[in-house]
Curated annotation (Swiss-Prot):
Protein name in the entry: HTH-type transcriptional regulator TfdT
A molecular function (GO) term: DNA-binding transcription factor activity
Domain of life, per lineage: Bacteria
BP GO terms, sorted: catabolic process
DNA-binding region: 18-37
Species of the source: Cupriavidus pinatubonensis (strain JMP 134 / LMG 1197) (Cupriavidus necator (strain JMP 134))
A Pfam cross-reference name: HTH_1
Keyword Transferase part of the UniProt annotation: no
PROSITE patterns in UniProt: HTH_LYSR (PS50931)
Any single GO CC term annotated in Swiss-Prot or TrEMBL for this entry: cytoplasm
Signal sequence, renumbered to the chain: none
Subcellular location: Cytoplasm
Gene giving rise to this polypeptide: tfdT
Length: 228
């Protein structure tokens, strides 16, 4: 049984005759007839009955028509997926993240990616920035999301968004912080930051805001354990 035989069979069934089917398939009628006969021999059943107006499906032909259409659809789908894989549009995208991008940036990216490449899948996992860079260079992962990546040979990075930086405070600093209208108003307020892990880090960025603008560090720096 060949794929072209299935196509010929479906064409004859839909056209209701060999002549019309041959025209639609752009072949002469004798080769079409021979292929249908060969298909009937392979199946071991007659698929068409000749009538005054053309041909009609036999009981076996009606059953086989549904299967033939499904087989052809499967072949077409497999061909499309293989072509997509060859173009890099299917398979699994290994995505890693660190920090707040998991809340909005990563979900938005995954939705857009899957809408563009419906035959692909995305595996998402958490990974520190240092581990991300190592995994990207070794080919273990495909793409990483985070903040403040250091310049690394062999890895390309882009700024894809910004985040608003907020200040939270409790007694005895809440009144002073709530009245602050600029970064300079916070110079003497102790800051509690994430530990300085992978460099550059979020803590480095916050401290640099003060140092770059005012040539002065905040009034005090405290860090809390990442396990808290």
């Amino acid at each position: 049984m060949e794929i072209r035989q299935l196509k010929y069979f479906v064409a004859v069934a839909e056209a209701g005759g060999f002549g019309t089917a041959a025209q639609r398939m752009h072949i002469s009628q004798p080769p079409l007839t021979r292929q249908i006969q060969a298909l009937e021999r392979d199946i071991g059943a007659k698929l068409f009955e000749r009538t005054a107006r053309g041909v009609e499906l036999t009981a076996a032909g009606k059953v086989f028509l549904d299967d033939a259409r499904q087989l052809l659809a499967l072949v077409q789908r497999s061909s499309r997926r293989s072509q997509a894989a060859a173009r890099g549009e299917s398979g699994e995208l290994k995505l890693v993240y660190f920090g707040t991008p998991v809340f909005e940036t990563v979900p938005a990216f995954v939705r857009t990616f899957l809408a563009t490449y419906p035959d692909a899948t995305v595996a998402v996992s958490h990974m520190t920035k240092e581990a991300q860079l190592e995994s990207l260079l070794s080919g273990v992962v495909d793409i990483g999301f985070g903040r403040f990546y250091p310049v690394t040979e062999g890895v390309s990075s882009w700024n894809i968004g910004t985040e608003t930086l907020h200040v939270a405070a409790a007694d005895p600093w809440d009144t002073r912080v709530s009245r602050a209208r600029a970064v300079v108003d916070l110079l003497d307020v102790p800051l509690i930051l994430y530990p300085r892990g992978d460099r550059p880090s979020f803590a480095d960025k916050v401290v640099s805001i003060f140092r770059d603008r005012f040539k002065k560090s905040p009034g005090g720096l405290l860090t809390f354990s990442a396990s808290c």
